């Protein structure tokens, strides 16, 4: 606060340096000195004290008028009391008027006070009447005294308020309606005190009802101000409307009753009846006014009603519509008695809303929760339509408001909420701005309700550290890039994670005639659950045993997959901590199963029967989801996993459990080189543990790197990346270059002074490329590189990474990636064939197309993916053998990936998707072939990860561990292993589980299966829209069906998958011959149907022609070769043809000159993911098994020797693709 500078006193000005100041004689400070006026710097202390002046503030409020104004008007609570008193006074006057009417008797005579009374009678046949009954009434003395006192008080209060609220215009206040009514109802009573004959004068005191209405409105406003309630307009308007109706009826009743004293002499009840009948427009006519004054009053009342009420109703309807838009309030009473969560979003779309509601209410214990949506924008038509459905209208409340306003947070009762979900708007053009809004919302909620759990979704990883205080945070770009990276080495990781984080009962596809759809849908119901080991029926018998032992036997006995645990004293979750980890009763176990153990029932009747027969019992599990019984007895002479033919011996050092170990016999037969499956030990045996998968005894020479390759391998070192592109990235041990690569060497297509390479072939990579197409090199792209360069990946199997960027990366990003080996970038786009060829697409195994930020929003809904879909379709037809993973903005657009207009199988899947959506499935899109195969992904599918964390607070941590975003010491990592024909002696998934647990302590969690299908176009309307023929079906083999309908493939049989063999069906004469045989059989069946033979014949002809049509594919190959030569790329062995421009090639593809869609290799196979399949699931060639491999650095000192010897026995790499060394 500014203060005036005090002038020097004359004595101070004359005093010299050595003089004593005049103020020294008064050293005491004056009482009440303002602390805002410190002592001046000049002179002595005594002089400063003498010059100080006491300043008193707000002296204007000390006047009598201001004090009265503060009490009557300004102060909320005191003014509320005054208005309440005034309201009570007006009601009292109305009550006294009614008492006066009831006590009045016109038959006793009418006249002034103290005068002679006369009786007046009304002649109904005449229109004349007397005014005396209207002017004079009978008023008792006591009643008159009370009315005079009340009128005097009201008059004085009115005069005081007029004085206090005077603003310079007295006439405006005098002619105000309320002042006029006050004078009419109070001043006559005061006059009667001085003029007694007027004491019986009629005074319309009933008009005080309007003053009472006005006082009530002011009182409610003050009350709302006192309790800080601002959202009360709707309540006020309803109250005003009700009071207006009441005042109109009361005024009409009293007015007609009084005027009819000179006419029909009606009582109050009859007058009230007449008013109600008249205002309701019924008008029976049994009671009517007799004289013209009362008739005139009725007309005036009707006119006033016709004017006032429509205005009131209009205001009420307007406020009602505004309230419908804003959503009203969530009452404090409901917030205290009910449970609710708040969803904060920038804009609410129907897809986001349904994903949230379906996932949130999929959990049984959340059925009684309410969802309060706080959104600043108006509710759109689709959302409004959904929220009107009874299923959601009773549980979802939409409030229009901002999370930055405390008033809106109060409306949502955020401080009473069970949780607050804050979601970013991913479809914004400026995603950084969207993150900033999310951060502010999170801060506002934390400030307003610090105890409310926060679940925050952030887009950019560099913004994540701003919301680290939140209970759960999901960074979209971190998860997206890590998942797309794992898709390249563990196929369909995106599908695996998506299915795990969606709540499902595994009932999808169970009505389908296709076996793979039933199995795939059943396994999709597996989720991650947790339970304390001491409370678990699944795991408590394994206390004191190794983690691997418990995982294998729990899967064998109950069909559950134990994937990790958490120590009671440690907050870190460990995935597959390895066989050296001994389970304790206090451990929290995390497992994959159809449903949680608490909802499972255990049936042991069959086990008791087997025990009576002398056989080793097998526990059966039959949960509420009807999980089939797991039969784990192997057949056909192979080594059995049960205890039927094994020797039992006491366990060594094991406590609890069954006290036995498996001692499995060796395989019979001469010339067999397959080892038997060793038992899983209760306690770890360091000498027997190998850190890699040992499904076959490959020779050491097969995996020993050559000398040339060994030189390149030695160049890499293990360490932590020195430069993180953003704050908050988890440190991960990676393969690094000993010396950072210069920025110029990171450019793939341009040589520099360090090397002259200008294309991918010149580098001579040993492994095939992984190409990532992105618009910009954002910080999230760093998380694509880290999982592919993690220390636990084999150095021999590191794939070169090429970043195909639309815009040049900045130096900050290059500084972060220059330490990684074989990471390059190139400027270009996926819609440019030259760019694709220059970055080495013909030498690549995987192409990842990342959704572009600039195209995430479109004027028309769901059109944001149009460009991406068309570009990927072009590449799909140009390079059919390339594995392309595409990110889309909208999951519903995945049906356009690898689109084939005449594919009846896709049409059948579309019908199945609609059926599942009608059944209320959260995974209706799961049967789309691109999604099942892991070739398409949308980050919105991972929104459920944040929602599911409300019930499972560990899901985000487990997902980040699986994706390699976080590394916890002692925790395992996700990898994959390919099953070849040489490994089919294992036969079943359960035996594979035992093999992996006993040899390398790896935990399998699922299978990625690829099957060969011949897609047809049936013409029987009663038949399904697809006919699938497996290779085994073509060979007319009869295979045993398991409980889940899985095929029992023979060891010599092969299933044509997309990971093996050529993409050209010409090279498979057996497939072609069998397909034609199948077509002829189908043709013979079709001829039995009358009227359909010509159609079937045309269709068979078309199929035959499509099997032999290869000219278009050859033409496309020539076009691509020609573009390579034009760009100066190596084309050894290609014929010289005339050059064509890149646009010519693209146009010829898009115009449909290539007609051989039905023969492409990708289109003859389908792939899908089986999460935690039953133990008796048969393995098939080209199956890829998802593994959680234990941390290689967990026990380096004790296992370094065994790891050195294990390298020669590794079956195959974690990379699911063929890892043959190829010199490009």
Curated annotation (Swiss-Prot):
Binding-site positions, K(+) 3: 747, 750, 755, 757, 763
Main location: membrane
Chain residues that bind Na(+) 2: 747, 750, 757, 765
Intramembrane region list: 268-288
Sugar-modified residues: 119, 123
Transmembrane segments: 80-112, 140-164, 179-194, 202-219, 233-260, 291-324
Binding residues annotated for K(+) 2, in chain numbering: 764, 773, 804, 806, 828, 851
Cytoplasmic-side positions: 1-79, 165-178, 220-232, 325-1224
GO cellular component, one term: postsynaptic density membrane
Quaternary structure and interacting proteins, as annotated: Homotetramer; which constitutes the Na(+)-activated K(+) channel. Interacts with KCNT2; these heterodimer channels differ from the homomers in their unitary conductance, kinetic behavior, subcellular localization, and response to activation of protein kinase C. Interacts (via C-terminus) with FMR1; this interaction alters gating properties of KCNT1. Interacts with CRBN via its cytoplasmic C-terminus.
Protein name per Swiss-Prot or TrEMBL: Potassium channel subfamily T member 1
Organism encoding this protein: Mus musculus
Gene name of this polypeptide: Kcnt1
């Amino acid at each position: 606060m500014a203060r005036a500078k005090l002038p020097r006193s004359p004595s101070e000005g004359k005093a010299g340096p050595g003089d004593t100041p005049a103020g020294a004689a008064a050293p005491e400070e004056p009482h009440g000195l303002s602390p805002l006026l410190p002592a001046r710097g000049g002179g002595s202390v005594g002089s400063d004290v003498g010059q100080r002046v006491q300043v008193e503030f707000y002296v204007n409020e000390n006047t009598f008028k201001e004090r009265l104004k503060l009490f009557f008007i300004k102060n909320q609570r005191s003014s509320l009391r005054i208005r309440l008193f005034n309201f009570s006074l007006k009601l009292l006057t109305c009550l006294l008027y009614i008492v006066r009417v009831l006590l009045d008797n016109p038959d006793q005579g009418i006249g002034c006070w103290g005068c002679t009374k006369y009786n007046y009678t009304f002649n109904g046949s005449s229109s004349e009447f007397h005014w005396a009954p209207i002017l004079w009434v009978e008023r008792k003395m006591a009643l008159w005294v009370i009315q005079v006192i009340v009128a005097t008080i009201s008059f004085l209060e009115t005069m005081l308020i007029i004085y206090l609220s005077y603003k310079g215009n007295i006439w405006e206040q005098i002619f105000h309606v309320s002042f006029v009514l006050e004078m009419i109802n109070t001043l006559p009573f005061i006059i009667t005190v001085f003029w007694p004959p007027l004491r019986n004068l009629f005074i319309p005191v009933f008009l005080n009802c309007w003053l009472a209405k006005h006082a009530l409105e002011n009182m409610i406003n003050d009350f709302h101000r006192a309790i800080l309630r601002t959202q009360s307009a709707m309540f006020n308007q309803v109250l005003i409307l009700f009071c207006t109706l009441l005042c109109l009826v009361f005024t009409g009743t009293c007015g007609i009753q009084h005027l009819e004293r000179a006419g029909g002499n009606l009582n109050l009840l009859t007058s009230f009846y007449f008013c109600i009948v008249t205002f309701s427009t019924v008008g029976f006519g049994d009671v009517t006014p007799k004289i013209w004054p009362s008739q005139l009053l009725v007309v005036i009342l009707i006119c006033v009603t016709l004017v006032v009420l429509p205005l009131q109703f209009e205001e009420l309807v307007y406020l009602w519509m505004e309230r419908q838009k804003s959503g009203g309030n969530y009452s404090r009473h409901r917030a205290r008695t009910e449970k609710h969560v708040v969803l904060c979003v920038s804009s609410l779309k129907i897809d986001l809303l349904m994903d949230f509601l379906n996932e949130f209410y999929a959990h049984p214990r959340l059925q009684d929760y309410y969802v309060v949506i706080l959104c600043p924008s108006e509710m759109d038509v689709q959302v409004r339509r959904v929220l009107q459905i009874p299923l959601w209208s009773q549980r979802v409340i939409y409030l229009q408001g901002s999370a930055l306003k405390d008033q809106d947070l109060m409306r949502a009762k955020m401080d009473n909420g069970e949780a607050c979900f804050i979601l970013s708007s991913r479809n914004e053009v400026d995603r950084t701005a969207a993150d900033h809004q999310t951060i502010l919302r999170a801060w506002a909620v934390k400030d307003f309700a610090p105890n409310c759990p926060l679940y925050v979704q952030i887009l950019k990883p560099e913004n994540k550290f701003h919301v680290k205080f939140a209970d759960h945070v999901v960074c979209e770009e971190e998860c997206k890039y890590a998942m797309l990276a794992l898709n390249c080495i563990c196929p369909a990781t995106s599908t695996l994670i998506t299915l795990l984080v969606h709540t499902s009962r595994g009932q999808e596809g169970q009505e389908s005639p296709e076996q793979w759809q039933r199995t795939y849908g059943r396994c999709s119901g597996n989720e991650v659950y947790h339970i304390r080991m001491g409370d678990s029926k699944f795991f408590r018998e394994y206390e004191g045993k190794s983690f691997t032992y418990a995982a294998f036997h729990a899967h064998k006995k109950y069909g559950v997959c134990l994937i990790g645990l958490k120590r009671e004293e440690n907050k870190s979750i460990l995935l597959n901590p390895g066989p050296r980890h001994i389970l304790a009763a206090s451990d929290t176990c995390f497992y994959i199963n159809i449903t949680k153990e608490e909802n499972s029932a255990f049936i042991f009747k069959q086990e008791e029967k087997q025990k009576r027969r002398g056989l080793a019992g097998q526990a059966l599990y039959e949960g509420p989801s009807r999980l089939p019984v797991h039969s784990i007895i192997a057949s056909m002479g192979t080594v059995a996993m049960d205890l039927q033919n094994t020797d039992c011996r006491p366990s060594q050092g094991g406590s609890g459990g069954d006290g036995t170990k498996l001692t499995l016999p060796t395989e019979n037969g001469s010339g067999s080189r397959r080892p038997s499956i060793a038992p899983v030990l209760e306690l770890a045996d360091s000498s027997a543990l190998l850190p890699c998968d040992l499904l076959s005894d490959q020779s050491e020479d097969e995996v020993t790197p050559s000398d040339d390759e060994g030189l390149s391998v030695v160049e890499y070192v293990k360490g932590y990346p020195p430069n993180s592109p953003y704050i908050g990235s988890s440190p991960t041990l990676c393969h690094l270059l000993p010396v950072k690569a210069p920025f110029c060497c990171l450019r793939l297509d341009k040589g520099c002074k360090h090397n002259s390479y200008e294309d991918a072939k010149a580098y001579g990579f040993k492994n095939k490329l992984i190409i990532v197409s992105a618009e910009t090199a954002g910080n999230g792209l760093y998380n694509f590189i880290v999982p592919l360069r993690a220390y636990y990946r084999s150095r021999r199997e590191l794939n070169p990474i090429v970043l195909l960027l639309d815009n040049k990366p900045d130096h900050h990003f290059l500084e972060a990636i220059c330490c990684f080996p074989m990471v390059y970038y190139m400027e270009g786009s996926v819609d440019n064939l030259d760019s694709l060829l220059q970055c080495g697409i013909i030498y690549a195994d995987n192409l990842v197309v990342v959704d572009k930020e600039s195209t995430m929003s479109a004027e028309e809904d769901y059109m944001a993916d149009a460009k991406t879909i068309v570009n990927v379709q072009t590449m799909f037809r140009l390079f059919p053998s390339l594995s392309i993973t595409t990110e889309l903005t909208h999951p519903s657009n995945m049906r356009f990936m690898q689109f084939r207009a005449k594919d009846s199988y896709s049409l059948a899947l579309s019908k199945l998707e609609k059926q599942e959506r009608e059944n209320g499935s959260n995974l209706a899109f799961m049967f789309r072939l691109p999604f099942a195969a892991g070739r398409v992904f949308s980050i919105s599918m991972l929104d459920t990860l944040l929602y599911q964390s409300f019930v499972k607070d560990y899901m985000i941590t487990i997902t980040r561990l699986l994706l390699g975003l976080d590394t916890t010491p002692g925790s395992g990592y996700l990898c994959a292993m390919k099953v070849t024909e040489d490994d089919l002696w294992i036969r079943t998934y359960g035996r594979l589980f035992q093999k992996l647990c006993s040899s390398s302590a790896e935990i399998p969690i699922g299978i990625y299966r690829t099957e060969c299908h011949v897609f047809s176009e049936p013409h029987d309307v009663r038949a399904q829209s697809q006919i699938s023929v497996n290779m085994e079906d073509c060979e007319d083999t009869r295979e045993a069906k398991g409980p889940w309908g899985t095929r029992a493939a023979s060891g010599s049989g092969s299933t044509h998958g997309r990971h093996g063999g050529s993409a050209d069906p010409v090279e498979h004469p057996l497939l072609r011959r069998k397909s034609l045989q199948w077509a002829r059989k189908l043709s013979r069946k079709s001829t039995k149907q009358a009227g359909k033979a010509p159609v079937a014949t045309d269709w068979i002809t078309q199929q035959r022609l499509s099997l032999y049509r290869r000219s278009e594919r050859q033409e496309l190959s020539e076009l691509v070769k020609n573009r390579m030569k034009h760009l100066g790329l190596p084309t050894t062995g290609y014929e010289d043809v005339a050059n064509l421009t890149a646009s010519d090639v693209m146009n010829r593809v898009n115009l449909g000159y290539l007609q051989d869609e039905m023969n492409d290799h990708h289109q003859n196979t389908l792939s899908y993911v089986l999460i935690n399949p039953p133990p008796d699931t048969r393995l098939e060639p080209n199956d890829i098994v998802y593994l959680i491999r234990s941390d290689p650095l967990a026990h380096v000192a004790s296992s370094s020797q065994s790891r050195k010897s294990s390298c020669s026995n590794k079956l195959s790499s974690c990379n699911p693709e063929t890892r043959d060394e190829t010199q490009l």
